[in-house]
């Protein structure tokens, strides 16, 4: 994922309010009286969320499958440990006060058994709290569904076509980017992605089965209670 277009990824996330999401997370950390000295960020990408939690005095580790994205992240932060690894293959060797993952990284894990194992692995190495978000079934089925979208931003034009497979609880994203070059020609970059539709109850069950004693779920966009139309749900687990 994000192979060729890693270098334009930051520009393509212009409409994501990272600061708002970080404030929701910080509010939940404050409620639990957790001031983490060690942080593990899963699916760190190019570090767009990282800047709201990182400082050089922390033991900060980030994991991502994309080497290209990690190279961008490494240019932004010093004194940070970056691991190029599939989350489901990750072997954690130390404990962390705070483990988190944002922007539907969990939805990209298509095998429920692998996700269950990941949660168990995280529980064993989490001394404080684990937080992550998912795209809800409402968003993936009702909002995204079999729809298509067209976007234009600065020198980038792109189309986004979805295909939802109800029997498999999967949704494919077919994204075509057209990036304007200096000579006014366009470079086409195609990216195909797949997300799994997980019910909130199924995720909750896996978390309890992994050993977490408490699981709280809120609307990540509002920081408040879940609604029928919640598109992004934040899980707080400890």
Per-range role (PLM):
Residues 1-45:
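Conserved class I S-adenosyl-L-methionine
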Residues 47-89:
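Class I SAM-dependent methyltransferase SAM/SAH-binding core
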Residues 91-98:
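A short acidic, Gly/Pro-enriched loop at the edge of an enzyme's catalytic core
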Residues 116-129:
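A short glycine-rich, Lys/Arg-flanked "PGG" loop and its adjoining helix->strand segment in the class I
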Residues 134-202:
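SAM-dependent methyltransferase
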